Regions:
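Hydrophobic transmembrane alpha-helices and their helix-loop junctions in integral membrane proteins
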Residues: 1-189
Length: 189
């Protein structure tokens, strides 16, 4: 799907821009050096926004999630399993890792609100869904927004729960898309 290519490449560009600025400013790509460096408040907020959106396009977060449902519906089940079980989780890990290394002391309320809107929006779209692949895709979007919310919240005990939830979702979403494929092969619908 062209949506998949466009949105994930746009996300990659934003992450690359933030990473390049970090390496240029710090003078090193080592996490220990980056962790010790102090960014100004404007730099921290700008970098967090770039990383939030860049990885958010790949996760995907609200309102940039439409490519995921289109991709899941159009793609074969094997790719849906790979996309939901690995690619989306890799973006979550990237956001978590860079966010934990940078440890910005900024107000993340607007980012938490965006993720919360994604949870509610996906829940409402799941309500009357008749396409089972779209239903599973919206479930993935809902849960990824919930985990993104947890990572933006920043509390260490909640983040641990988010990591466990991410691993669990990786296995269960793969299983759900496998079951969708089984139903499709059995009933051709």
């Amino acid at each position: 799907s062209i949506y998949f290519v466009i949105w994930t490449q746009l996300g990659s560009f934003l992450v690359l821009a933030a990473s390049a600025y970090i390496v240029y400013t710090v003078g090193s790509s080592e996490f220990d050096m980056i962790r010790r460096f102090t960014f100004s408040e404007v730099e921290a907020y700008t970098l967090f926004t770039l990383l939030f959106l860049g990885f958010g396009f790949k996760v995907p977060i609200w309102p940039f999630h439409y490519w995921l449902t289109k991709t899941h519906v159009e793609a074969p089940s094997g790719f849906s399993i790979y996309l939901s079980g690995f690619l989306v989780k890799s973006a979550l890990y990237g956001f978590y890792k860079l966010n934990s290394v940078l440890a910005f002391e900024i107000n993340t309320s607007i980012f938490i609100l965006i993720a919360l809107l994604g949870v509610f929006d996906s829940s409402l779209k799941m309500w009357g869904q008749t396409d089972i692949k779209k239903l599973v895709a919206y479930g993935t979007i809902q849960e990824m927004n919930l985990i993104y919310l947890v990572f933006c919240w920043g509390d260490s005990s909640i983040i641990t729960a988010g990591i466990i939830f991410t691993a669990t979702h990786a296995f269960l979403s793969c299983l759900m898309f496998y079951l969708v494929d089984c139903v499709y092969r059995r009933y051709h619908t």
